């Protein structure tokens, strides 16, 4: 009787730990994407304004977990110059993507509302973003 009770308590603790640890791990994966962007040297005439990350089903159809990281930069360089600069850091087609940022809302995120806190009132703001990956088993288990 005592062993059954202890085994039951252990099982409950393991299940509760999974409910906490899997989302924490997935958020950590998204944070690593953000960190990678922040640690990348900025081009000249460019300043880092803000960084953000998000995990979840963010775009497209089907299931699965997506890890998104982005930085908001203000630059005197053109979009083409920034794309050329960041293309040197790309290891695949989902990293270091550059777009003009108008307003606070991040438009590449379809299924969640994600926005920068910085008010964007004029031109010269760009978003540099990457889609990351993590352990394929845990990304399917986010609760």
Description of each model-found segment:
Residues 2-69, 74-143:
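An acidic-aromatic pocket/loop used at catalytic or ligand-binding sites
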């Amino acid at each position: 009787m005592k062993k059954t009770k202890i085994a039951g308590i252990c099982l409950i603790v393991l299940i509760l730990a999974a409910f906490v640890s899997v989302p924490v791990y997935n958020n950590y994966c998204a944070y690593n994407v953000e960190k990678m962007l922040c640690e990348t040297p900025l081009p000249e005439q460019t300043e880092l304004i803000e960084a953000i990350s998000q995990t979840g089903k963010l775009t497209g159809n089907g299931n699965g977990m997506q890890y998104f990281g982005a930085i908001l930069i203000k630059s005197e360089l053109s979009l083409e110059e920034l794309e050329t600069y960041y293309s040197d850091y790309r290891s695949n087609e989902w990293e270091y993507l550059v777009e003009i940022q108008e307003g606070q809302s991040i438009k590449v995120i379809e299924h969640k509302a994600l926005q920068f806190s910085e008010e964007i009132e004029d031109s010269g703001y760009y978003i540099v973003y990457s889609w990351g990956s993590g352990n394929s088993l845990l990304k399917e288990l986010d609760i």
